[in-house]
Regions:
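Short hydrophobic/aromatic beta-strand micro-patches
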Residues: 127-131
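Intein/HINT protein-splicing elements and their conserved insertion hotspots or analogous self-processing inserts
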Residues: 1-122, 132-215
Length: 215
């Protein structure tokens, strides 16, 4: 494993100023066969939230996180989890949208969470895709909620519906004015290269000496 970090105390780009930032990371090796990607895989599957409660000081209860991690690790090894992603800045709704981008599969959310909690930070929480049958078993774990059903090409939440393609364009286009993702369309004809003949290759069929000592 590895633990590291970086402190960025200054930085500017044109008229954009970067505030002092502390970034930390941790990496642990694992088997590729036990890795699960984040993109939603199958229509009809269920999206379930493994929540992360906090104490009075607002700190995550690590015992709950460890229990969830151990449980999910065993379910991944058993092949019961199709997709999984840690809830990040922006909350459950933003994280689910990023999971939808890969295969353009949407989610129809239920009413198991109040609207504001879909956009609240749940650091330490995990979104999981699994079958409807397994979701019922998963929901027996503490601090879990079934959020909705995967399918279609849009995200549906509290009566609002937005196409996944529209969300993806908005997400990818945020930094286009600063770092364009596509080169300008330059109308130029490609040059015609002259034809060249293949150069014959020669091989030596005799064995070469192999000295054992070099002086």
């Amino acid at each position: 494993g590895a633990i590291g970090g970086k402190d960025s105390m200054s930085g500017t780009f044109n008229d954009i100023h970067v505030p002092p930032t502390l970034v930390s990371f941790a990496v642990a090796p694992g088997k590729a066969s036990e890795a699960v990607s984040q993109e939603l895989k199958k229509e009809g599957d269920v999206l379930i939230l493994f929540g992360q409660p906090k104490d009075e000081a607002g700190m995550p209860l690590l015992d709950v996180f460890k229990a969830h991690a151990d449980f999910l690790y065993q379910e991944v090894k058993a092949g019961h989890i199709a997709a999984m992603k840690a809830v990040e800045h922006g909350g459950v709704a933003v994280t689910a949208a990023k999971m939808a981008f890969g295969n353009k599969l949407g989610v129809t959310f239920g009413e198991n969470l109040p609207l504001f909690k879909y956009f609240s930070n749940f650091y330490g929480a995990i979104l999981v895709e699994t079958t409807p049958e397994l979701a019922e078993e998963f929901a027996k774990q503490p601090h879990t909620k079934i959020l909705g059903t995967i399918g279609g090409d849009s995200m549906k939440l509290c009566g609002e519906e937005i196409a996944v393609e529209e969300l993806l364009r908005s997400y990818e286009g945020t930094l286009d004015p600063i770092f364009p993702r596509r080169a300008a369309d330059i109308q130029k004809e490609a040059p015609i290269l002259p034809e060249t003949k293949a150069i014959p290759q020669f091989y030596v069929h005799t064995n070469l000496s192999r000295p054992r000592v070099f002086i």
